[in-house]
Amino acid sequence: MPNFRILGMFTGIIEKIGTITDVIQSGSNLQFWVNSPLSDELKIDQSVSHNGVCLTIEEIKDGSHRVTAIQETLQKTNLGAWEKGTLVNLERCLPFHGRIDGHLVQGHTDVTAVCLEIEDKSGSWVFQFQYPSEFAQLLIEKGSVCINGTSLTVFDLTANTFKVAIIPYTYNNTNIHTVSPGDRVNIEFDMMGKYFARMMELRSKD
């Protein structure tokens, strides 16, 4: 039989927060040790979303697991800024029988966005982010976007900025509470939007 691998999918619903306990330079790659409540439940070669980036579990030891980010990943995401103590959003792959409580996420970061402003609404928070305008066709008002692995809803959309509203549960149970103005977050746009944009691009060339 041919040797193939079914790629994992995620939903943008964070299961646990992990903590970076060690960062190891390995050639052009970075290896990260992550301590988390999920680590002992994982398996070697399992795909797990870390801040929205699909990484492969390489080693598990004493309530922690190790993953590697290659140079391309470090260039396209915020993983290069991780250090000891950094909090990381974790989500295991969606099982075939599972519910899609967020939206379908591949674990492939498209671009990073910069946090511009945080408004405290006395019970919720509104975060504004700036992203490269060439991706504007991939966002719609009230559409889905994945920020550091978390499925959120877009509003107040412009050509290069958007806002998301954060409820207390999300604020306390993801690493969004660690984001400050000026910080970069990983962005994955909605998969269906990307396929539609690609289809329209190809049609325009006919």
Per-segment meaning from a language model:
Residues F4-D206:
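Conserved loop->alpha-helix
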